[in-house]
């Protein structure tokens, strides 16, 4: 299996081009005003037009007002919505658009393999479950979490595709892939020079590290 790669927190056209040229499968726009990577829907709509076919656009929200989500759906037309706050399963599904549900792994109530797996099961309609590290903020913290907490999810035959995030970069993503065998990895701060400013060299190095890990798993 090939590990898919999403580069999140894009704010500049040049960074989208770098991600696409390196082979990223998806790019993410952050619509959470509290983030340093926040983009206005008008800008995201312009940037979205530079994304070629067969590269997914993901819109990230944190506890949004329904009108704000609908505005992004209308203006930007993302392929997927990523919910990164405290949204219920019904709130995630209400828009009729494929969605990812993020879990702040290690947070109270999500701090054992059993508790985490149980929380995930409520979101069985999701296109994927994304696991990020728990911190005071939401996403892009650059912090890793104990991947042993995913044991219950990985053992669940009904689990949705596992998307690994949280403190990933070119130096550690290979080890994480070999340990967790995720469907995809989601990286933001690990390929940045500053919040919202991606490094082409770091993006290329990350994609190379992912491919090398996949080759090792295939015995190549």
Curated annotation (Swiss-Prot):
The keyword Ribosomal protein does not apply. GO terms for molecular function: phosphoribosylanthranilate isomerase activity. Its EC number is 5.3.1.24. It is an enzyme of class 5 (isomerase). It holds the Pfam family PRAI. SUPFAM superfamilies: Ribulose-phoshate binding barrel (SSF51366). CDD domains: PRAI. GO terms for biological process: L-tryptophan biosynthetic process. Pathway: Amino-acid biosynthesis; L-tryptophan biosynthesis; L-tryptophan from chorismate: step 3/5. Keywords: Amino-acid biosynthesis, Aromatic amino acid biosynthesis, Isomerase, Tryptophan biosynthesis. It catalyses: N-(5-phospho-beta-D-ribosyl)anthranilate = 1-(2-carboxyphenylamino)-1-deoxy-D-ribulose 5-phosphate. Gene3D superfamilies: Aldolase class I. Belongs to the TrpF family. This is N-(5'-phosphoribosyl)anthranilate isomerase. It comes from Bordetella petrii (strain ATCC BAA-461 / DSM 12804 / CCUG 43448). The gene is trpF.
């Amino acid at each position: 299996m090939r590990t898919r790669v999403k580069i999140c927190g894009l704010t500049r056209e040049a960074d989208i081009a770098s991600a696409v040229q390196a082979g990223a499968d998806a790019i993410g726009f952050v619509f959470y005003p509290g983030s340093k990577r926040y983009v206005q829907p008008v800008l995201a709509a312009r940037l979205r037009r530079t994304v070629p076919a067969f590269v997914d656009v993901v819109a990230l929200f944190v506890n949004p007002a329904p009108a704000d989500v609908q505005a992004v759906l209308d203006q930007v037309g993302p392929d997927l919505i990523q919910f990164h706050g405290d949204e219920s399963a019904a709130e995630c599904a209400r828009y009729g658009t494929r969605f990812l549900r993020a879990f702040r792994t290690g947070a109270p109530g999500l701090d054992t393999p059993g508790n985490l797996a149980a929380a995930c099961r409520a979101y069985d309609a999701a296109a994927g479950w994304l696991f990020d590290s728990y911190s005071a903020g939401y996403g892009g913290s650059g912090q890793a979490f104990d991947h042993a907490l995913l044991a219950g999810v990985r053992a669940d035959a009904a689990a949705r595709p596992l998307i690994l995030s949280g403190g990933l970069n070119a130096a550690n993503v290979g080890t994480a892939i070999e340990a967790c065998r995720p469907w995809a990895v989601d990286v933001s701060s690990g390929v940045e020079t500053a919040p919202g400013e991606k490094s082409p060299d770091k993006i290329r190095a990350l994609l190379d590290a992912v491919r090398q890990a996949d080759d090792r798993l295939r015995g190549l």
